[in-house]
Amino acid sequence: MSFKGLKPIVYGGREVWPLVEGGKGVAATNHMSSGAWAAAGGIGTISAVNADSYDSEGKIVPQVYSALTRKERHQELIRYAIDGAVEQVRRAHEIAGGKGAININVLWEMGGAQEILEGVLDLTRGMVTGVTCGAGMPYKLSEIAQRYNVHYLPIVSSARAFRALWK
């Protein structure tokens, strides 16, 4: 594939087209769209916000919270989020067939963002190339990205926000 006037870049150790699927919230981008972007040589971006999980028949697993306390239900939410995002990454990686790159998108202000991000990155080592993050000031994201050897692509709303994150 070629694009007039556009040259590939090296991202995460592989040559890709500098075409990035925009990160969207709440399960808006999944393994199908992200895997297709990567298979075409671009950078697919999976929403790691309430991502879908599937049962053995390929049906979406409903996220049902059965715990009695708010704290326990929050832990259920985190578990669903990690399981769903990991499943989406694995499926996208398979569709990509070794081409392009896969990023994940998280909303820093969602409940349990850091725990979810670390859980997903821990279980998808070698499959995720970068993390985009908006909805808040993800001060700790650069440290997390460094620890997991992935790129950090913050979504910033202003020059002031950029300066604060750059410190």
Regions found by a protein language model. Give the residues of each.
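Active-site entrance/lid segments in N-terminal catalytic domains of soluble metabolic enzymes
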Residues: 1-167
